[in-house]
């Protein structure tokens, strides 16, 4: 019984030594393949170096080289950072830097957002937009030029003058239209949205309600004018009446004139008598 236990113990011990030797040989092979490889990799690294960081990544992670001064460090990320695009290969998932003028990209030849000062057009970053397109400084993209669009004209309005449809022969009529699409910076300007033309209609008398305030005002002015005219006529007639003398006034006037003549004659006689003496 004791012999069996001792033999089992030695068998287990030999098996553990065998596993340890296998792990050691695997580590020596990895060190030969990747010099300076650290066995304590972190941050998603499958293999790594104390000097260069990650050398390979765990499945589904992307490998990217980050420059720190003159040194490049390998990093494993779940997605590529801004300015890089990801490509999956059978043995590695890799992040590759976009072009110099591109901020974010889908692949090497298709940019989705340009850096400041460039305009995006069909996946490329341009200094200026091609002919037939214009730059949108808000989205920093080359967009189509938009021209103004207007609706059809409305029917002509009724012939009117000073807001009324009666009391005149010559007036004006108007028609309008709406702007359906406003133009972009380089688009054609919008046309006028209203037109007015002269119209001639058969004169018709305004009803009391149609005369309105202006009609009442004209009527009031007419009445005031007639009243002033009547006042002027009455004052003229009074002046004329005052210039005509009544028979009594004429008789008194003649009597006064006779008295004046008698007094004059009497004075002349007295002067002649004094001269004779």
Curated annotation (Swiss-Prot):
Cellular localization per UniProt: Secreted
InterPro entries (UniProt xref): Furin_repeat, Growth_fac_rcpt_cys_sf, R-spondin, Rspo_Fu-CRD_dom, TSP1_rpt, TSP1_rpt_sf, TSP1_spondin_dom
Tissue specificity of this protein: Highly expressed in endothelial cells.
GO molecular function, one term: heparin binding
CDD domains tied to this protein: FU (cd00064)
Superkingdom, natural source: Eukaryota
Glycosylation sites: 36
Gene3D superfamilies listed in its UniProt record: Hormone Receptor, Insulin-like Growth Factor Receptor 1, Chain A, domain 2 (2.10.220.10), Thrombospondin type-1 (TSP1) repeat (2.20.100.10)
Signal peptide, first to last residue: 1-21
Keyword Signal: yes
Protein name from the UniProt record: R-spondin-3
Originating species: Mus musculus (Mouse)
Gene name of the encoded protein: Rspo3
